[in-house]
Amino acid sequence: MIAHWYVHWQNIDSSWSRLFDQHNEHRIALPRLIFFTDLGWFRGSWYFTLGCLFLIQLLHAMLLTKLICSALSCHAISRLMVGGIVVALMFSALQIRNLVWGLQVQFLGVFFIGTVALYFLLRSGTTSQTSHSVWKSPFLVGAFSCVAATFTMANGLLLWVVGMMFGIKNTWSVKRLLVFWTLASLVWVVYFADFQFDPALPRPWDTIHQLWPVVQYMAVYLGNPISPAWRECAIVLGLLGMISTLLLSLSFTFDRAHRIFNSHALRTLLAIVVFVLLTALITALGRIEFGVEQAMASRYATPALIFWIATCALLLSIRVKSRLILLGIRQIGAVITLSVIFSALTFQLKIPEIEQQFRLTRLAAAASLLSNVYDKSVLEHIHPRPPQIMSVVDTLREHRLSLFSMEIADLIGQSLEQSLSITPRDQCAGHIDQVTDLASDRNGFRLRGWAIDRTRDKPADQIIFVSEGLIRGVAFSGVERKDVEKHYPGIKRSGWFGYARVNPGVTVQAYALIHDNQSACLLNGRYRR
């Protein structure tokens, strides 16, 4: 995570002046404050950033629950049920990347701040309320939340559009509309001052003519969380959601007496749905060149789930005169609600598998970076442009940031005998099983094997590689080895995966770290390059 943005901000003290600098198409000033805090106080360890991720999602779930319970007029037991469902969806494994990757704090943040903005902007719904002073109402909280969302992620700009549309329909006073429009204009001017489009991405207006592919992208974007394994079904569900939003918006537009959308909660939920739909549109226009498959990325599950939570709440709570139409709306809402819940619960069963895959991917990337070996195929899983990571590794190592704050990072390049005590070989078991040269690094190679700490009857968590008396690389255990488990019952994940950097003609040996990583125990097998 740190490497993803640290390329341009290698000195915290000099970075404040660049807080609003462009990052791709975004200006992520608020997320950078979180990153700087993590970097300065927690040495880039992720703890603070991931804590913020959890808190943002929890607060968002609580606010959505409040809106839904208000719209449905829920009692105490019903509130608990609604809250449980919303929390389960907001922390669903469908959006796993957003919940475990620190950089995604901006992705979760913009939708939470957007909900807060719309909640306060639309809180004044009657003519008498709108006559109140602009400076003494929740309006200001909503307006400045729009500013915060804008400088969290680019789609925050859409809140000004949504806010203006709903403000006009909500009969804001001329004074309030003027203040909001002025602030919106100022923010847009500041945002696009010295703005540069990424040459690798199409301009949104250049892809408008691709109407059907854009619609398909939007449909997959919205429908994928309900049908993650069947794209055609996801398209149908996404189209259903888009049509529902269109019909609800038309009903809201012509509902002059507020008979259908008769509460602040209903209007806010509709505004949230429109905001997410516009986000899907802008995303489709900017990403359609990558193909419709790109809309299935797990990061998009967060706005899609918010979309369905709000849509289902609307379908289950709005009131119309025709009993037949009302029954149809309720049935559609119930079916979609059950489908979303079923999909989320089904996907939760995959959490152990997903967690293990993420863990191994990160450990492999950490081993590559700690060993100073460039394995492009592994680093692509944690960063879209692996060379950028290698360009900041020396800086991260020098300042002991992120993974270089780990104790094992200090061992690389050090003498084995001076850094660790050597224990008898009967205190461990293991072997180097496979060594693979890397096309992306001439002097680096990948090693696989297994290791067991016999003093504790458990896998040895960390392994080091030694040549010519110096520690040249590291590996981490966690790979399931059923063949080893046959000989050591109960020890499942003794397999390790790591890297070493050595010159041709030297021999490499592997040592398991035991005794709280204070001692090294030689494993069987050696490799001569």
Segments (PLM) and residue ranges:
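Juxtamembrane "helix-exit" motif on the non-cytosolic side of transmembrane helices
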Residues: D38, C69, F91-W101, Y191-P199, ...
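Aromatic- and kink-enriched transmembrane "portal" helix at the membrane-lumen/periplasm boundary
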Residues: L80-I113
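Transmembrane alpha-helix segments characteristic
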Residues: M81-L89, W181-V189, I260-R287
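Intrinsically disordered, polar/acidic, low-complexity terminal segments
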Residues: M1-E25, L39-I85, K136, M165-G167, ...
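Perimembrane helix-loop-helix junctions
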Residues: L158-V189
